[in-house]
Amino acid sequence: MATRFRSTLLVITLFVLIDWVTKLVVLLQYKDLQILTHPTLYTHSWGRFSFSIAPVFNEGAAFGLFSNYKYFLFLLRIFVILGLLAYLFFKKKSIQSTTQTALVLLCAGAIGNVGDIIFYGHIVDFISFNYKQWAFPTFNVADVLISLGTLLLVYKFYFPTKQTEKKR
């Protein structure tokens, strides 16, 4: 196995572990508060803006969408992970660093959420932001990784480097 791919797997593993550890810490804290209907583990407010940590169990995709298709979503996530890993392995020499970083973030986030489904039967979300009456959907570290990876790919598409333009 090539050194570059091995280091890529190491970075993916590190991100997945960070995601899983944060979820485990929240779930262990939540376990003590299960007598409450919807316990909030931590809340902090700055004027009209607030941040809270409270576990929410999500059986769908982003923001709980398509929760009726959880088995299809699970298989789709597995195929996406396998596709990303295959691309990272077979294109390891020609892939640009920005693209590689984006794919690593996407892969780590997907693995983190698939791990939740395997171990808990649902995705564990716990980070929540609110502004006045507006509440952003609850998310987790894996979702942040997926969002950052997606933003990097969009950035790369709209602002290609000279190397990318030559390949087109």
UniProtKB/Swiss-Prot annotation:
Top-level class of the enzyme under EC nomenclature: hydrolase
Record-annotated disulphide pairs: none
GO term, biological process aspect, one: proteolysis
Enzyme Commission identifier(s): 3.4.23.36
Transmembrane segments: 8-28, 70-90, 104-124, 134-154
One cellular-component annotation, GO: plasma membrane
Location(s) in or outside the cell: Cell inner membrane
Span of the signal peptide: none
UniProt keyword annotations, A-Z: Aspartyl protease, Cell inner membrane, Cell membrane, Hydrolase, Membrane, Protease, Transmembrane, Transmembrane helix
Recorded catalytic activity of this chain's protein: Release of signal peptides from bacterial membrane prolipoproteins. Hydrolyzes -Xaa-Yaa-Zaa-|-(S,diacylglyceryl)Cys-, in which Xaa is hydrophobic (preferably Leu), and Yaa (Ala or Ser) and Zaa (Gly or Ala) have small, neutral side chains
Pfam families, sorted: Peptidase_A8
Predominant location category: membrane
Entry function: This protein specifically catalyzes the removal of signal peptides from prolipoproteins.
Protein family (similarity comment): Belongs to the peptidase A8 family.
Name this protein carries in UniProt: Lipoprotein signal peptidase
Gene (UniProt): lspA
